[in-house]
Amino acid sequence: MVGYQMLPPVLFNETIIPMTDSPYILYGGPVSLYTGKVRSYLRKNNINFVEVHPNSERYLKHIVPTVGRWIMPCLETPDGRIIQDGADIIDYFDNEVKLSRFPIRPTTPVHRAVSHLFELFGGEGLLRPAMHYRWNFDEQNIAFLESEFSISVIPKMTEGKEQINFARSSGRMRKAAITFGVGPHSVEAIESSFAEWLELFSAHLANNAYLLGNRPTLGDYCLMGPMWAHLFRDPAPTALIKKTAPRVGRWVERMTTYEPYDGEHFESSTAPRELLANDTLPDTLVAMMRFVAEEYLSEITAHVEYANNWLAEQTDLVTGTNGLPDPGARGIGKTSFAWRGIEIETAVMPYRFWLLQRLQDAFAECDATSQTAIRTAFRNAGLESILDLRTIRRVERANHLEVWGPLL
């Protein structure tokens, strides 16, 4: 693949000598949901990079101490700068070094707001199907997952030890699935919901190569996290996608390539890479936004309410910290809410509020006329309240960690 080179092992040693023609180093893994959007962006924009697993010596001895926790993705630039988090990594390429082939943030207000909506939903709103279809289909998935997880182990283990290691790591991930609301009581609703998502996305892709037209934007890249790492690579869900929503599968494949991959949109390989005209939203995209409202609005609303109550109780919380004993901890508790006719409980993570703020900040930057247009579009999709849903402290990122800002 153009721009995706394998490099000599010397680059993975503890000391890396910066070179002007050196690649960027992406610390992540094929099974990682959050690495998926960054890898897609790098490939789609033909950026020279190599992917290194986060169990490498360089990652463990240098990256983890720098960012304060074992987490992926992380990026190391040729001059040695470390950037953690997919949103920050994409911002670096798009805003700072300006390596995007095409703008990933629309300039028109409604399209920009919608791209940030799917940034939030892509990263956080499809976790239930991603975890369910990975960890509740052992007959179809287990051999693949054992093989995938085994390549993350350094040094190489014997087969018996690999199985023990996989049992341990997969056990942790199965517990994580529960914290995202996956359980016997929710399985039927998760599968019904995901089938609806595939149907709606497929209908939209019948006339659009990407979410907002003829080129990918931020929302496309962020949807690639769950749609690639879990839902298209793992055997059980990819079989479902290929059987019931092959257009969605082709979108996933388009999002992994630099070269044009537009067989079903013949004009798009030669036509200008433009977005939908006049800041419009086709009915098929509005239907997808309504799905986001039904699927995720009750959850993020409950999380903000929980966080505000929690923050009110933390009378000694120091601004610039996460208010927890472990500075690298991501969750502040759990809360329950009504979802598709049942009640589920999920972990409350401030990182989600940081993504939500990106949508709200984009809205706040608009003039009154543009804000009215955004509100109208979101109201038509049942999502207007998300524009005003705020915690009493902003979430900030400092030294690669989520921290609370001052009281508002």
Task: Give the residues covered by each predicted segment.
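Inter-helical turn/loop segments and adjacent helix faces that build the functional surface
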Residues: 97-103, 180-185, 207-212, 233-240
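Short acidic alpha-helical/loop segments enriched in Asp/Glu that coordinate divalent cations
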Residues: 212-215, 233-244, 260-274
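GST superfamily/GST-like fold recognition
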Residues: 209-231
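Small-residue-rich helix-loop
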Residues: 268-289
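All-alpha helical catalytic cores of prenyl diphosphate-utilizing isoprenoid enzymes
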Residues: 164-173, 180, 184-199
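GST-like domain detector, emphasizing the conserved glutathione-binding G-site
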Residues: 11-160, 211, 231-232, 285-408
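A non-catalytic, amphipathic alpha-helix used as a structural packing/dimerization or gating element
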Residues: 110, 114-117, 189-196, 200, ...
